[in-house]
Swiss-Prot record:
UniProt protein name: Cytosolic Fe-S cluster assembly factor nar1
Lineage: Eukaryota, Fungi, Dikarya, Ascomycota, Pezizomycotina
Family that this chain belongs to: Belongs to the NARF family.
Keywords per UniProt: 4Fe-4S, Iron, Iron-sulfur, Metal-binding
Region (Disordered): 419-447, 482-504
Keyword Methyltransferase (UniProt): no
Annotated positions binding [4Fe-4S] cluster 1: C20, C61, C64, C67
Origin species: Aspergillus clavatus (strain ATCC 1007 / CBS 513.65 / DSM 816 / NCTC 3887 / NRRL 1 / QM 1276 / 107)
One Pfam family in the UniProt entry: Fe_hyd_lg_C
Gene Ontology annotations of biological process type: iron-sulfur cluster assembly
GO molecular function terms attached to this record: 4 iron, 4 sulfur cluster binding; iron-sulfur cluster binding; metal ion binding
Residues that hold [4Fe-4S] cluster 2 according to the record: C209, C264, C464, C468
Amino acid sequence: MSAILSADDLNDFISPGVACIKPVETLPQKESQSENPYEVTKEDKIQPENLPPAQISLTDCLACSGCVTSAEAVLISLQSHAEVLNTLDAYPEFRLSNESGQDDIKTTETADSESRVFVASVSPQVRASLATTYGISEREAQCMIDQFLSGSQGLRAGGKFHNGFAWVVDTNTMREAVLALTADEVANSLTSIDPLNTLPKRPILSSACPGWICYAEKTHPFILPHLSRLKSPQALTGTLLKSVLSKALGISPTRIWHLAIMPCFDKKLEASREELTDSAWGPTPSEPHTPVRDVDCVITSRELLTLAASRGISLPRLPLKPLPRSYYSPFPDRSLDSFLFSKRSSGQTAASGTSGGYLHHVLTTFQAKNPGSQIVTQRGRNADVVEYVLMSPGGEPLLKAARYYGFRNIQNLVRKLKPARASRLPGARQSATSAGGSRRQLASRNAASAGSGTDYAYVEVMACPGGCTNGGGQVRIEDAREAASNMSVESQTEPPEAALKPTPHEQRAWLARVDEAYYSADSDSEVPATSEPASVISRDAEIHGVLQHWSEYMNIPLSKLAYTSYREVESDVGKTQTGPNDTARVVELASKIGGGW
C-alpha cells in the first residue's frame, strides 16, 4: 500500500468534527474465572477496561460505507509514487521527432520496441494545493509541475533512462468538454421522450466523483438510473490521449503510459474500473487480449511531493517559468493540439465552486437560453447544501437544481430519492374506501418527502465536504509546515518552531487559502483577457466541433468515447467469505485490470 496513505488520512479532511458512519465492532471480553459471580462490586472499584485499539483500514473507510473490498484495496496500493519510478526505470522513452510538422510526427521506433510514451494530466485542485504549500501563484505551481515532469532539472535528471513526460495536459480542458455535454444531457432529459432509457432519469446526479459512484453502486443501486452517463475529466482525458496517440503513432495503447495527478485517493478506484479501458471504445479485437486502462496510474498531491523527495528533487528550487516549446513535440493533430494546449480562461470562480462547476455551467447555459431569467440561491441546512432556481422574468421557475457535498448530506439526498415501498401484510384485505384512502395518504406522504428531491433537474454530488479542493490526497497543513522546515534547512536559516497539531480553525483557514488559490487561476495568467469573453453558447458550440473532429479522426462514435456505464455491485465488507480468498480475487482482478466493480 502506498506509504503516504495512513489511518490519519482516512477522515478525508472532514473537520472539525469527524463522524465515521461505519461502527467499530469489538468482541466481548472473556470473563475472568477468578472473580466471584456473587460478589458485589462498588463503582469506585471498577477498573477501566483496556479495549483493543480500533483498527480502521482502507477497506472500512475509503469512500465510506464499506465501498472498497479488501481486493480492491490491493489494486489501489499498486498505484503509488513507487509505481511511477519503477515504470520510468523499466522502459526507455518513446522518441518523437517534430521536424515534419504537427500532423506527421516521425519516429525511429520499431513496432516491437519496449519503449513507452509517457503522458501526464494534472487537475487544477492539485495546482492550488501546491501553490498554497509553497506560497506561489497557481500559474507558478503549473510551471513547477511541468519542470518536474518534463524539464531537464526534474525527473529527466536521474533514473535509469532519464525519462520524462512527453506531454503534460491540464484536465481543465476536458472538463470543459464534460461541462458542454452535461448541459446537453440535462436539456435532453427535460425535452426528450426516452422510451429506450438511453438518458438518465431526473434528477440527473453528477458522476465525476468516484467516491460517490462507489457508494451508489454498492449501497443504493436504485440511484444508478439517475447517474450522469458522462465520463469524468480524468477518464475522458485518458481516453483521448490513448486513442489519438495510439492511432497517430501506430502503436498499441499498452505502450502509452498515462499518469494522472489528482486531489483524492478515490480517483485510483476510478482508474481501476474495467469500463474505463480500451475495450469500451476500441475496435473488437480478433484475439482475446487484456484490456488497457485509459489511466494507468493515479497519484495525489501529497504523493507528488513524495515522488520528488524519492528522486532528491526540491520542488521549490525548480525554475518557476514555462518550459520552452522545444521540450514538447506538437500533439499529432493540429486541431486537438490547439484545443489541449490553448491559453484561455479556466472559469474557476467562487460561483462555480471548487469541484469543476458542473451545476454552475448547467444553470448559466439555461440562463443564456432564457434572456432575462435570474438564478435564485437558497442555502440548505449547512454550507455544503445549496439549492438553485432559475426564475423567468415573470417569476416562474424554469429549472431547479442543487449541490450536495459530503456523505452526510448525500445520505439525506438518497433518502429523498428512495422509491416508496408499500408495507402490506401478505393476505391482508382492505375495503375499497380504506384502500383508496390509504393510497391517497401514501401518495401525499411520498410527495411531501420526495418533492424536495425529485423536482431537481440536476444535482452536483461530491463526497468531500467543501468539494474537491478538500480531497483526501491534498497537501495538509502539517505537510506544508514540514516542507517549510525542510526549505529552511536547505537555505541554512532558522527553521520554524515545531507546531502542535493544527486546530480546526487552522484547518479551515488552510482550506480557505487553497480555495483562494484555486479561484485565482485566471488572475495569475499572463494571457491578457479578451474584452468580450465568449458566451456560454458559442464556447459550447466550439467544444462540440472539437469532439466531433475527435470522433471522426478515430472513426468511433462519440457515445463510445465520452460516455460510460455503471452496475450494481454487492459489497463483501463485513460478510463471511465462503468463496475464493482475497489473494485469489486480487489475482483475478489484476488480470482483468480493474474488474471487481
